[in-house]
């Protein structure tokens, strides 16, 4: 039986993510775990996260999961969600600058709260404009709406990494993809039909873009 590890480092939206995966899993086994051996044994890995990046990085290192994340992001289908996307970059300007995992080149910066009428965090439904084809977009229409909750967004060094963009005072990268990695700023587990479709696509994806 195929398996998916959902990484538990104390900051993920674990119940919502696991419940959503279970809805589309079929015969795929869902394992919510912080155990490095069980994570490494999984065929696919989901890296969720909510909260502050400094706490995220502290917990990953405390649990020796930073190395596990890097290993899994290198060799199997890997899905990052929200903070799990941001942690893949090199540096976040949150908390006066926090070094991240450095798996994808780029940085994380805050929305410009000085602009008139711009509410931070960016919270609610917004469109994801697909800028490149990818298996995880299968059966998901262009400009589909997903659910967002975040104050920071990724700025990748390479435009080729961007899989979708979303407008919120600026056009920001709402999904990044490279090889076996697909990572999203929105919450597919809270995005109803098309969020579930993205998760279902992930469970059948072979890790080839």
From Swiss-Prot:
* Reactions mediated catalytically: 5-[(5-phospho-1-deoxy-D-ribulos-1-ylimino)methylamino]-1-(5-phospho-beta-D-ribosyl)imidazole-4-carboxamide + L-glutamine = D-erythro-1-(imidazol-4-yl)glycerol 3-phosphate + 5-amino-1-(5-phospho-beta-D-ribosyl)imidazole-4-carboxamide + L-glutamate + H(+); L-glutamine + H2O = L-glutamate + NH4(+)
Could you list this entry's UniProt keywords, alphabetically sorted: Amino-acid biosynthesis, Cytoplasm, Glutamine amidotransferase, Histidine biosynthesis, Hydrolase, Lyase
Question: Where, per UniProt, does this protein localize?
Answer: Cytoplasm
Name any one GO molecular function. imidazoleglycerol-phosphate synthase activity
Name the EC number(s).
4.3.2.10, 3.5.1.2
Q: Which domain of life is it from?
A: Bacteria
Q: In which pathway does it act?
A: Amino-acid biosynthesis; L-histidine biosynthesis; L-histidine from 5-phospho-alpha-D-ribose 1-diphosphate: step 5/9
The record describes its quaternary structure and partners as: Heterodimer of HisH and HisF.
Entry function: IGPS catalyzes the conversion of PRFAR and glutamine to IGP, AICAR and glutamate. The HisH subunit catalyzes the hydrolysis of glutamine to glutamate and ammonia as part of the synthesis of IGP and AICAR. The resulting ammonia molecule is channeled to the active site of HisF.
- What name does the UniProt record give this protein? Imidazole glycerol phosphate synthase subunit HisH
Natural source organism: Nitrosococcus oceani (strain ATCC 19707 / BCRC 17464 / JCM 30415 / NCIMB 11848 / C-107)
Lineage here is:
Bacteria, Pseudomonadati, Pseudomonadota, Gammaproteobacteria, Chromatiales
